[in-house]
């Protein structure tokens, strides 16, 4: 059985804890929670960090997904809950496309991560992909070190990173930076990390994931 990178990281962290070795990075519970995109999303919702409209619980079947997709509104993006690297993702522009998109994404997720748990989000058309670098210590202090614009991608894989982003005004940069810090604190994150955000032309932005 293939393990997701998140599961592998949790196992290594737990081994260090058992052997009383100091691990540079967040503890195993944090890695486990953030490695599951659905759990991470719900954590941000509870903390008041803006997220894209989507499923509140994991989705396992086409039938479940079709009902939730109808409530969210099309277009829909289907994502692997334990995914990463652009794998296990498909877009359904209409209800007619949903079954094929879901099954294809789920099969890819099962092969890549050993887990077919999915979640759904409303698909944001032509957003910018912005990442904020954060540093957090074990005492609850968190700072961000500015942003990178990772919008130039191919098949959901980043090709060029630009810093600072020309799309951000000073006011928007401050607002997004504060949200990134809030997200890290909500997850009880420690060490260096990255908050990934989608930014619309309107200036609205949404938490996507943290790693």
Label for each model-derived stretch:
Residues 1-7, 11:
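Single conserved hydrophobic/aromatic residue that forms the stacking wall/gate
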Residues 3, 36, 40, 172, ...:
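Hydrophobic (often cysteine-bearing) scaffold residues that line and stabilize catalytic clefts
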Residues 12-23, 94-99:
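A glycine- and small-aliphatic-rich helix-loop capping segment at beta-alpha/alpha-beta transitions
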Residues 17-81, 88:
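A conserved helix-loop-beta module that forms one wall/lid of the active-site cleft
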Residues 59, 70-82, 89-211:
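Internal nucleotide-binding/catalytic subdomain
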């Amino acid at each position: 059985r293939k393990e997701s990178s998140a599961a592998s990281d949790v196992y290594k962290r737990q081994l260090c804890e058992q052997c009383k070795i100091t691990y540079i990075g967040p503890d195993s519970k944090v890695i486990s929670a953030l490695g599951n995109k659905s759990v991470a999303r719900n954590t941000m919702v509870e903390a008041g960090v803006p997220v894209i409209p989507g499923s509140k619980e994991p989705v396992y079947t086409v039938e479940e997904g079709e009902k939730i997709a109808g409530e969210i509104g099309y277009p829909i993006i289907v994502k692997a809950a334990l995914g990463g690297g652009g794998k296990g993702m498909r877009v359904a522009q209409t209800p007619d496309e949903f079954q094929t998109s879901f099954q294809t994404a789920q099969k890819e997720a099962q092969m890549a991560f050993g887990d077919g748990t999915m979640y759904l989000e409303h698909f944001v058309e032509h957003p910018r992909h912005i990442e904020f670098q954060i540093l957090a210590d074990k005492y609850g202090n968190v700072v961000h070190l500015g942003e990178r614009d990772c919008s130039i991608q191919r098949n959901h894989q980043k090709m060029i990173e630009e810093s600072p982003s020309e799309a951000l005004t000073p006011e928007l940069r401050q607002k997004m930076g504060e949200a990134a810090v809030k997200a890290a604190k909500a997850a009880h994150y420690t060490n260096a990390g990255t908050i990934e955000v989608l930014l619309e032309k309107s200036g609205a932005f949404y938490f996507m994931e943290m790693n």
